[in-house]
């Protein structure tokens, strides 16, 4: 893509929402550090996290954590590691880089939770756990104003959109979309439950209002439904579209 073409296109994108879409494409992909010595659990969780669009690092011991810490945007941290209790080192690690930490542990008492949170953890999830809950907690921490992280992905129960790489995963499978299909999907998924008229979608996604026909929106919605079967984009007759939460 030439710089001249990009500049001309960006000038047409007068709406704030569409300028944000352009900016999102340059955000850095988020990296998670999983600190877990249970090989089976770690292997399965790493696969799921990568399918959700995250880059992943893995450490099995306290000794391995320090070399990875400054590369991560969030840490999923087991407490009971082969070389000790990880929370005893948490304050020191956070001095290297203050990033969100989710403790994922079999220690379940109130005292255990208080100890972990007082040591600097941002969240505490006990084993056994549901992946969906862990992923929701990850998303919550990464979009928190206190995390200092860019929210470079849109994630729902079955959909992951990476704004930086323009990759889309639906039900764990990679989906190839055109540029406009991607922009439309990203906009709707970023505004779950909100209703938009066809003219509003033309403005936000295409970047200008004067387009030959609003049927263009209908065509692209149809293409998204065909490429992502089961995607819940609802048609409100006589009004427009919304994506269900």
Swiss-Prot record:
One GO cellular component term of this record is:
protein-DNA complex
Q: What is its main location?
A: cytoplasm
Instruction: Give the keywords, sorted.
Output: Activator, Cytoplasm, DNA-binding, Phosphoprotein, Transcription, Transcription regulation, Two-component regulatory system
Domain of life, per UniProt, equals Bacteria
Q: Which Pfam families does the UniProt entry name for this protein? A: Response_reg, Trans_reg_C
Which SMART domains does this one have?
A: REC (SM00448), Trans_reg_C (SM00862)
The protein's name is: Transcriptional regulatory protein VxrB
The scientific name of the source species is Vibrio cholerae serotype O1 (strain ATCC 39315 / El Tor Inaba N16961)
């Amino acid at each position: 893509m030439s710089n001249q073409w990009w500049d001309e296109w960006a000038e047409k994108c007068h709406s704030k929402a569409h300028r944000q879409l352009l900016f999102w494409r340059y955000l850095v992909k988020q990296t998670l550090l999983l600190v877990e010595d249970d090989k089976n659990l770690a292997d399965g969780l790493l696969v799921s996290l990568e399918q959700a669009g995250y880059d992943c690092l893995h450490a099995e011991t306290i000794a391995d954590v320090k070399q990875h810490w400054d590369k991560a945007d969030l840490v999923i941290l087991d407490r009971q590691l082969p070389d000790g209790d990880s929370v005893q080192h948490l304050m020191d690690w956070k001095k290297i880089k203050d990033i969100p930490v989710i403790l994922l542990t079999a220690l379940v008492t109130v005292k255990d939770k208080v100890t972990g949170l007082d040591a600097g953890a941002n969240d505490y999830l006990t084993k056994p756990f549901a992946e969906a809950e862990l992923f929701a907690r990850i998303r919550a921490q990464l979009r928190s104003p206190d995390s200092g992280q860019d929210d470079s992905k849109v994630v729902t129960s079955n959909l992951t959109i990476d704004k930086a790489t323009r990759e889309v995963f639906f039900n764990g499978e990679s989906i190839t979309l055109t540029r406009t299909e991607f922009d439309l999907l990203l906009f709707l998924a970023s505004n779950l439950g909100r209703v938009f008229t066809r003219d509003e979608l033309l403005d936000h996604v295409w970047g200008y209002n004067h387009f030959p026909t609003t049927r263009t929106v209908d065509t692209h919605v149809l293409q998204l439904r065909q490429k992502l079967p089961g995607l819940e984009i609802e048609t409100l007759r006589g009004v427009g579209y919304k994506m269900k939460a």
